[in-house]
Regions:
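Short terminal or interdomain "cap/linker" segment that borders an active site or interface and mediates
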Residues: 94-96
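Short beta-strand-centered segments at strand-helix junctions
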Residues: 1-46, 51-78, 84, 98-126
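Long hydrophobic alpha-helical segments typical of transmembrane helices together
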Residues: 110-152
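Short, charged beta-turn/beta-strand-edge "cap" motif at the junction between a beta-strand
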Residues: 49, 87-91, 133-136
């Protein structure tokens, strides 16, 4: 387990879907910091246990970028984009990637271990950010529409 900052008002534990399933914890995909209605857990270490009543999440995949980068890409904070990746026989299109904009960020995409392992690359991975629809686009709704015969 890694301990990461910044320090927050409430303790948060980010896990992969695989880990939540192994531990029998409900998988709740959320943006970092959005912990209302999430399960808790007991954290055990060499100096004892800490029980947190909420805060276990599977972090929603996201991109950090600066305001200048967001302006250049015509993307706003909390927009959702697609990221097309290239790898050796396992290229992926990541959907529903939330963009987080802040002056202290630098351009980087954050995915969990499961998502990183699905991408096969022995070099530094890279991707192309694409917006197919408006900032309020929802992939789940698109799939439901397609299955219902509604074509966009």
């Amino acid at each position: 387990m890694a301990l990461l900052g910044p320090f927050r008002k409430n303790t948060q534990v980010e896990m992969s879907l695989t880990d939540t399933r192994k531990l029998g914890i409900p998988s709740v995909i959320r943006q970092s910091g959005d912990i209302e209605g999430t399960p808790g857990c007991i954290l055990s270490g060499p100096y004892g246990d800490i029980e947190i009543p909420k805060g276990v999440i599977v972090a929603k995949r996201h991109i950090h970028m600066t305001p200048d980068e967001s302006l250049a890409l015509h993307i706003k904070d909390n927009d959702e984009v697609f990221v097309l990746t290239k790898s050796y026989g396992r290229a992926l299109i990541y959907a529903d990637v939330v963009v987080r904009v802040h002056r202290n960020y630098h351009l980087a995409m954050h995915v969990d271990t499961d998502e990183a392992n699905a991408f096969n690359s022995d070099t530094e991975p890279y991707g192309v950010i694409v917006r197919f629809f408006d900032s309020n686009f929802n992939t789940d709704k698109w799939i439901e529409d397609e299955l219902s015969g509604i074509r966009r």
